[in-house]
Amino acid sequence: METANYTKVTEFVLTGLSQTPEVQLVLFVIFLSFYLFILPGNILIICTISLDPHLTSPMYFLLANLAFLDIWYSSITAPEMLIDFFVERKIISFDECIAQLFFLHFAGASEMFLLTVMAFDLYTAICRPLHYATIMNQRLCCILVALSWRGGFIHSIIQVALIVRLPFCGPNELDSYFCDITQVVRIACANTFPEELVMICSSGLISVVCLIALLMSYAFLLALLKKLSGSGENTNRAVSTCYSHITIVVLMFGPSIYIYARPFDSFSLDKVVSVFNTLIFPLHNPIIYTLRNKEVKAAMRKLVTKYILCKEK
């Protein structure tokens, strides 16, 4: 990388999702309604699993972690995006940009690793039911979750370390509503091919390898469950759980691979895919799991009745 003198950029200007006031107002109402509707649902999932003594299996512990990561992941960009709808000049400082990049990749990669852990948990529950409690004990479950977070942290450190060493001398406009790493790399005043290649390999490797492993494991599980299709309600519930997992995997990994596992060129769909990737899909993930889980739904109804409706009376 060249070391010539340059004027360091201290802030970036975000173009946002739209420059039209009327469109901005409509988008604000839509995203705020969506965020305020789904966010409490994820919080309720965490509270339900934490407070209900019957939801002690590793599956529920992992689900609570997923809900937390999804809340965190979406909240990194959503509040600022909503505020910027009413700001004429949308500015983010260089330090805030780096912090946003770090936490976004930290939470996103951690969630991908966690989904892989959840697939292992489901595999153990279906294929080794008699040994499930022994294999997926509390200690192993905590270790796997900790490794997921550690993997996300290492991935995020790599991304940020590559960004901070780049020179930024102008322009400083990012064609996005948040500090997107693909946009930041594009405006650096240097040849970014080596950094971009490492970023694509890092993000793409995590996304593609995890996706292939997950799809192969679910294909194996569904094939196994198809042979046991006459075994009753438990088999049907396992199939339903598998489809829930597959739905989450597709929603999570599809946009991520589209954005980060290719050269950082600009395409017309980038902003739309980014909105789904950072806001809509993450907040839906735990909800999709919960809708197919009778135990969690029953516990949620019990919690709402006990702590909310009773207090109103």
Swiss-Prot record:
Entry GO MF terms: G protein-coupled receptor activity; olfactory receptor activity
Membrane topology: Multi-pass membrane protein
Extracellular side of membrane: 47-57, 119-142, 226-238, 292-313
Alphabetized UniProt keyword annotations: Disulfide bond, G-protein coupled receptor, Membrane, Receptor, Transducer, Transmembrane, Transmembrane helix
Cytoplasmic side: 1-25, 79-97, 164-204, 260-270
Membrane-traversing stretches: 26-46, 58-78, 98-118, 143-163, 205-225, 239-259, 271-291
Domain of life: Eukaryota
SUPFAM superfamilies recorded: Family A G protein-coupled receptor-like (SSF81321)
GO cellular component terms attached to this protein's record: plasma membrane
Compartments it resides in: Membrane
InterPro entries in the record: GPCR_Rhodpsn, GPCR_Rhodpsn_7TM, Olfact_rcpt, Olfactory_Receptors
Pfam families: 7tm_4 (PF13853)
Disulphide bridges, residue numbers: 97-179
Function: Odorant receptor.
Family indicated by similarity: Belongs to the G-protein coupled receptor 1 family.
Descriptive protein name: Olfactory receptor 4M2
Native organism: Homo sapiens (Human)
Gene: OR4M2B
